[in-house]
Amino acid sequence: MASATSAIPAVRAHLLELQRNLAASANVIMDGRDIGTCILPDADVKIFLTASTSVRAMRRYRELQEKGMMCNLEEIEQDIIERDARDMNRETAPLKQAEDAMLLDSSDMTLEQVVQAILEAAFSRGLAPGSQKASDHADSEAGQTKEEV
């Protein structure tokens, strides 16, 4: 649903403005299929998080099962394949890895391992919880934070 809705140009333009305004006003962590390429192309840390379609389908299947929802694993996997194809081939902001994004394939990783890998990527770029990069210190003293995480 989100994929189809975000393909509407007016919706995309409005969301783009909202997301950029949010990032300009505070340190943020954003998740989305075009955050690193379109929304925040100058973000300090970009992670292109992926997993095989079968693993993603199984994760979604388990999530739905835990909520007590009836679902079919094969249909879920087909939906994921179709969404990926639609997003990779859309005219506006197609799904792709940003050139400066770290590729993180979580197919064989636990949630804790994924979090650790992302934290290590942030730390390697000089970011730490509750702090700002030294280059942004002067701006933050004036109440303006330009860091985008």
Where is each model-derived feature located?
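ATP-dependent small-molecule kinase phosphotransfer cores
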Residues: 1-27, 54, 58, 66, ...
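Short, well-ordered beta-strand core segments
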Residues: 28, 44-48, 101-103
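NTP-dependent small-molecule kinase module
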Residues: 61-69, 85-86, 90-149
